[in-house]
A protein has these predicted regions:
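Active-site acidic carboxylates
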Residues: 1-115
């Protein structure tokens, strides 16, 4: 069977909680939105990844008494840095960034970080 080859733009974690005023904001993050919108129109597929955590995710400092973002803890798989609560499934912070205008009929979404 022949393999179908297509072009794809990969958009990684462009979510509200990672924009400047989000729970885990990145300076100037919103500056990528317009270029992504323009480029997305020229690709056959757009693959988007989203951080997608349950509220009691093990990496959230709020779920560990006396711990703060940036602290480290030991887990069975090794050292884990603790983060502010962010990209909780079903919240606006986990949504793709406001302003992204993607051709949804050509989008493939990958949710990650959804294990505990």
């Amino acid at each position: 069977m022949p393999v179908k080859v297509f072009t794809a733009l990969v958009v990684v974690d462009v979510q509200n909680d990672f924009l400047e005023n989000g729970a885990l904001g990145v300076p100037k993050a919103s500056e990528v939105i317009d270029p992504i919108n323009r480029m997305a129109q020229t690709f056959e597929r757009v693959i988007v990844t989203q951080d997608w955590h349950c509220a009691d995710h093990v990496s959230f400092a709020a779920n560990h008494e006396g711990k703060a973002p940036g602290d480290k803890i030991q887990l069975p798989y090794g050292e884990q840095i603790l983060w502010p609560t962010h990209c909780v499934e079903g919240t606006s912070g986990a949504d793709l960034a406001t302003g992204l205008r993607l051709p949804m009929s050509r989008v493939i979404a990958i949710l990650k970080g959804n294990d505990k």
